[in-house]
Design a protein with these regions (language model features):
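12-transmembrane solute porter fold
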Residues: 1-10, 15-17, 30-31, 36-37, ...
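Extracellular/periplasmic helix-loop-helix junction of adjacent transmembrane segments
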Residues: 18-46, 84-88, 284-288
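Small-residue-rich packing faces within the transmembrane alpha-helices of Major Facilitator Superfamily
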Residues: 45, 72-73, 96, 157-164, ...
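Membrane-helix boundary and inter-helical linker elements of multi-pass secondary transporters
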Residues: 25-26, 31, 56-57, 79-82, ...
Length: 454
């Protein structure tokens, strides 16, 4: 599981660094290279909704190992690509594997361990996932400079081989004995909605689409979602059952994830941009400055369980979400005169809070799911995580652009634009605290208590 999570996290950050080099090598306009990113993201958005059904139908071991193989073969094909078309097609294959790896891996954990151990196990398994984004930009820059852009993909091959070996040897094979009906129309509606919404977010953040196509894509996505849920209420076996939202911890976890990730999802975009554009850091120095954030997040994993045991999910998430928003706002106050040690301390504290936030949110969302709805609930969480992070980047890019106006990047007023953007993003994150306040004091502890009294 950890190997797959690491590959996914590494790929999310390493590719962007190499786009200019790819464009030069493939003799393409750099602006056209965004299709390399979009092909992967749209494939993942389209297939995540069906990951749970596929895993239950064909077995978690087979699908998880197969997903690693697809991702690895896709990486190999990307690494030997000699044209943009071949590279985009290879990224689609890589995206098919990526859409299944993490959701199915998390489903295996959910099925394998008692709920009272979920926080501890999830914290351990996601540690390598934190390493991926940490080393991605720096490793990508070094590979492009020292070797070539091809190696940002080829580096996945040995990792994938190791992951496949361990997946086949140690992954339990959970599979439904009775064949569950596949809701094909529901899949088309829901996946179509995910693709349309993802495309609108990419258009807003990276493709510089006009407002009309962005709004139209967003409306189409929302309309498809409405049609899906209206239909799901009236059929027997929908792709995602509306009954999932009768589980309070799941509903609160999903809604809280949306708002918290809307704020937090902007940080991988905003922080490096501010350090380089606002403070004049080099890409290498920016990567090194981000290290305390990830190291602190890793160091916080062992203390998440004791905090949740002591305070419970409700108090932990309400307090921590407010702190998260305040820390995001605090990044807006960083300026050219801010001592570097203060910046490093701020990022380290943010990393600690982040780690507690997302481990708590994710386990809260999954902790009360039963055997018959675990796959659907887990896939729904994966969909929300994918979309809300994209929404965070798109909304922060739009805010920064709006506050900047016609100001050139070297103008001192750009710092005011960053300041206003961080305040807004932090405020969005704080809104999640009101959602987590709807939890009951004992939520998240029920299963453990039942087992102890059994």
């Amino acid at each position: 599981m950890a190997t797959a999570f690491f590959m996914q996290g590494l790929d999310a950050t390493i590719v962007n660094v190499a786009l200019p080099s790819m464009a030069q090598s493939l003799q393409q306009n750099p602006l056209q290279m965004q299709s390399v990113i979009i092909a992967y993201l749209l494939t993942v958005a389209a297939l995540i909704p069906v990951s749970g059904w596929i895993a239950e139908r064909y077995g978690t071991r087979r699908i998880f190992a197969g997903a690693i193989v697809l991702f690895t073969i896709g990486s190999l094909l990307c690494g030997i690509s000699d044209s943009l078309v071949f590279l985009v097609l290879s990224r689609i294959l890589q995206g098919i594997g990526g859409a299944l790896m993490v959701p199915v891996g998390r489903l295996v954990i959910l099925r394998s361990y008692p709920r009272e151990q979920l926080v501890k196990v999830m914290g351990f398994v996601t540690l390598p996932a934190l390493l991926g984004p940490l080393v991605g930009p720096t490793l990508g820059g070094w590979l492009v400079q020292a070797l070539s852009w091809h190696w940002i993909f080829l580096i996945n091959i040995p990792i994938g081989i190791v992951g496949y070996y361990f997946a086949g040897k140690f992954t339990p094979n959970f599979q439904r004995e009775e064949h569950q009906h596949f809701d094909l129309l529901g899949f088309v509606l829901f996946s179509g909605a995910m693709v349309a919404i993802s495309m609108s977010l990419e258009g807003l953040a990276d493709l510089h689409m006009g407002s009309v196509p962005v709004v139209l894509l967003l409306l189409v996505g929302c309309a498809l979602l409405c049609i899906y849920w209206l239909r799901a209420i009236s059929i027997e076996e929908p792709l995602f059952s509306p009954s999932l939202f009768k589980i309070r911890t799941f509903t609160v976890g999903i809604l809280g994830n949306i708002f918290a990730r809307l704020g937090n999802g902007a940080l991988p975009f905003l922080i490096p941009l501010k350090l380089q554009v606002g403070l004049g850091y080099s890409p290498i120095k920016t990567g090194l400055t981000m290290i305390p954030l990830t190291l602190a997040a890793m160091a916080a994993k062992p203390i998440v369980q004791p905090i949740l045991t002591r305070l419970g999910y409700r108090r932990t998430l309400v307090i921590n979400t407010v702190l998260l928003g305040i820390m995001i706002m605090g990044l807006g106050f960083i300026g050219p005169s801010t001592p570097e040690v203060i910046i490093l301390i701020q990022l380290a504290i943010l990393g600690l809070i982040n780690s507690l936030q997302f481990t708590s949110m994710n386990t809260l969302t999954l902790i009360d799911l039963k055997e018959d709805n675990a796959a659907g609930g887990n896939s729904m969480l994966a969909v929300v995580m994918q979309l809300s992070i994209g929404m965070g980047v798109a909304s922060s890019a739009a805010l920064l652009d709006g506050f900047s106006g016609s100001v050139s990047p070297d103008n001192t007023q750009i710092m005011h634009a960053f300041f206003a953007t961080f305040l807004c993003v932090g405020g969005i994150a704080i809104l999640a605290a009101f959602i987590f306040f709807q939890l009951h004091a004992g939520d998240g502890r029920v299963r453990a208590r039942k087992k102890k009294t059994a």
